[in-house]
């Protein structure tokens, strides 16, 4: 009998929307063949949930929670198929329940956290609202000694956690708001991946005004434009959104702090969405209600 790996169970869960134990059992009975397992599941009571899981869940919401003393914070993305469901009280309550578990466990291992009670709650929600619901990802961040974590959620769709060394909760939240609005690539210029810099350098060298320039002059121009690129895409160097006369680093420093880093979630980023027109979406909602 083939060994059933955790990754195989996870894949089956993602494709069917069913519980971990049910997926493991199905894989065991199918001798590790995931397609056979899906076929068997669709022949039994898992048919309805399995069909729902085939639909793309690229809408949803982001929720956060920060410890009262600001020492750590968590953020979670939960996906639904439509924005309409993402605003439903049942969906919101489920997301809050899951983020509470993430906060309590201080763990971003969504697969493990979704075992048992939370997975049962998810399956019940799927049956109740008629859409595929997926707990996509979570993150846990901790502040250094004397530091603070800040959080900001915009419209339920963009969430940010920031970490400061020193500073205070208000400043940390302000920086999180800036990240939500401006979406910097990295916290500090030195954090920019070399591959990203190489790509930008190639773009600069291909620009018309670089043609025919002596190597020394061209290199100076490249370095100048890379410096500008880093300033525009690094959180600490950007003009602070609430006061463009100072950089984010200057704003934080004035409060006795220093930017450590940030994490930004935006609902559905990286998920390929299906194109569905509005009329069709309304008809689907009416059919499920």
From Swiss-Prot:
One of its GO terms (molecular function) is translation elongation factor activity. Keywords: Cytoplasm, Elongation factor, Protein biosynthesis. InterPro entries: EF-Ts_dimer_sf, Transl_elong_EFTs/EF1B, Transl_elong_EFTs/EF1B_dimer, Transl_elong_Ts_CS, UBA-like_sf. It is found in: Cytoplasm. The keyword Protein biosynthesis applies. Gene3D superfamilies: 1.10.286.20, DNA helicase RuvA subunit, C-terminal domain, Elongation factor Ts, dimerisation domain. Belongs to the EF-Ts family. Associates with the EF-Tu.GDP complex and induces the exchange of GDP to GTP. It remains bound to the aminoacyl-tRNA.EF-Tu.GTP complex up to the GTP hydrolysis stage on the ribosome. This is Elongation factor Ts. The lineage of its organism: Bacteria, Pseudomonadati, Pseudomonadota, Gammaproteobacteria, Oceanospirillales.
